[in-house]
């Protein structure tokens, strides 16, 4: 498996910091002997610039790894602690280069960092959880990749559930549209039926009126016939 670029850069940055500490110590020893040190000073200044570039690169790599979930938040915090230590060492080295710091403290800090790289207990590992305690970088990275895969699987399952719910919602919406269409058709049918009933009722009323008129006419005709019969009926 290819090495993690962050840790590769971190290792090279630590080497630069260690080299700067050694060069500063060498320069100070030369100055105590009254020797000129322009070449050493130029070398140290160049190494300090390289150290700053490396630290900025580590910051960018860490930010990208955390934002894209390539590593867990726990691992991100652990790397941030390592990065903070490098930033502190950079300030100490710069102060010592400018003769503003204590050389013994600077060299001791740098050597302690190198011993930590070789296996001396690291103060940030004292509170390390059981899941990662005693594991190497590759093993921790594999564990993180497994966690990320599990998280991705969970997100895929959640996405599938949401998709099914969305599909069910669309189906329910389509069914409601169909029910609304049926209700609209029934409403139109009821309205048409009601109109037909009103029309038939008007026809029945008209027929009733005509029937009543015909009855009156028949009565009148019968009365006329009766009058005529009585008039022509012989009295003897």
UniProtKB/Swiss-Prot annotation:
Cross-referenced Pfam families: SNARE
Give the sites modified to Phosphoserine. Answer: 102, 160
- Note the topology in the membrane: Single-pass type IV membrane protein
- Tell me, in one coarse class, where this protein mainly resides: membrane
User: Is the keyword Kinase in the record?
Assistant: no
| Subcellular localization | Membrane
An example of a Gene Ontology cellular component annotation for this protein is:
lysosomal membrane
Sorted alphabetically, which InterPro entries does this protein's record hold?
Answer: Syntaxin, Syntaxin-8_SNARE, T_SNARE_dom
Q: What processing steps or modifications follow its translation? A: Ubiquitinated by HECTD3.
Report the record's Gene Ontology biological process terms: cellular response to type II interferon; early endosome to late endosome transport; endosome to lysosome transport; intracellular protein transport; regulation of protein localization to plasma membrane; vesicle docking; vesicle fusion; vesicle-mediated transport
Q: Which residues form a coiled coil?
A: 42-65
Q: In which tissues is it expressed?
A: Widely expressed in all tissues examined.
Matching entries from PROSITE patterns are given as: T_SNARE (PS50192)
Q: Where is the t-SNARE coiled-coil homology domain?
A: 145-207
- Signal peptide coordinates: none
Which UniProt key words apply to this protein?
Coiled coil, Membrane, Phosphoprotein, Transmembrane, Transmembrane helix, Transport, Ubl conjugation
Task: Please give the residue ranges for the topological domain Cytoplasmic.
Answer: 1-215
Gene3D superfamilies recorded for this chain? 1.20.5.110
- Span-the-membrane segments of this chain are 216-232
Q: Which GO terms describe its molecular function?
A: chloride channel inhibitor activity; SNAP receptor activity; SNARE binding; syntaxin binding; ubiquitin protein ligase binding
Q: Which PANTHER family match?
A: SYNTAXIN, SYNTAXIN-8
**What does the record give as the function of this protein?**
Vesicle trafficking protein that functions in the early secretory pathway, possibly by mediating retrograde transport from cis-Golgi membranes to the ER.
| Family in the record | Belongs to the syntaxin family.
Q: How does it assemble?
A: Part of the SNARE core complex containing STX7, VAMP8 and VTI1B. Interacts with VAMP8. Forms a SNARE complex with STX7, VTI1B and VAMP8 which functions in the homotypic fusion of late endosomes. Component of the SNARE complex composed of STX7, STX8, VAMP7 and VTI1B that is required for heterotypic fusion of late endosomes with lysosomes. Interacts with HECTD3. Interacts with TPC1.
Name this protein carries in UniProt: Syntaxin-8
Natural source organism? Rattus norvegicus (Rat)
Source taxonomy lineage? Eukaryota, Metazoa, Chordata, Craniata, Vertebrata
């Amino acid at each position: 498996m290819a090495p993690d670029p962050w840790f590769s850069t971190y290792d090279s940055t630590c080497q630069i910091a260690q080299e700067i500490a050694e060069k500063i110590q060498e320069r100070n020893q030369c100055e105590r002997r009254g020797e000129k040190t322009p070449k050493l000073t130029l070398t140290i200044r160049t190494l300090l610039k390289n150290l700053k570039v490396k630290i900025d690169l580590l910051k960018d790599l860490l930010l990208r790894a955390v934002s894209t979930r390539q590593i867990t938040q726990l691992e991100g915090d652990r790397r941030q602690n390592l990065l903070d230590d490098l930033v502190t060492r950079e300030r100490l080295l710069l102060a010592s280069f400018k003769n503003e710091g204590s050389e013994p403290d600077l060299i001791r800090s740098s050597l302690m960092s190198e011993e930590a790289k070789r296996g001396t207990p690291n103060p940030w590992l004292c509170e390390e959880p059981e899941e990662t305690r005693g594991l190497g970088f590759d093993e921790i990275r594999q564990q993180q990749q497994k966690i990320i895969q599990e998280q991705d699987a969970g997100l895929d399952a959640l996405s599938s559930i949401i998709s099914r719910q969305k599909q069910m919602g669309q189906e329910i919406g389509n069914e409601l549209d169909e029910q609304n269409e049926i209700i609209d058709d029934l409403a139109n049918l009821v309205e048409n039926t009601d109109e037909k009933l009103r029309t038939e009722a008007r026809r029945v009323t008209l027929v009733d009126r005509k029937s009543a008129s015909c009855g009156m006419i028949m009565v009148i005709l019968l009365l006329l016939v009766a009058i005529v019969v009585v008039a022509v009926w012989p009295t003897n």
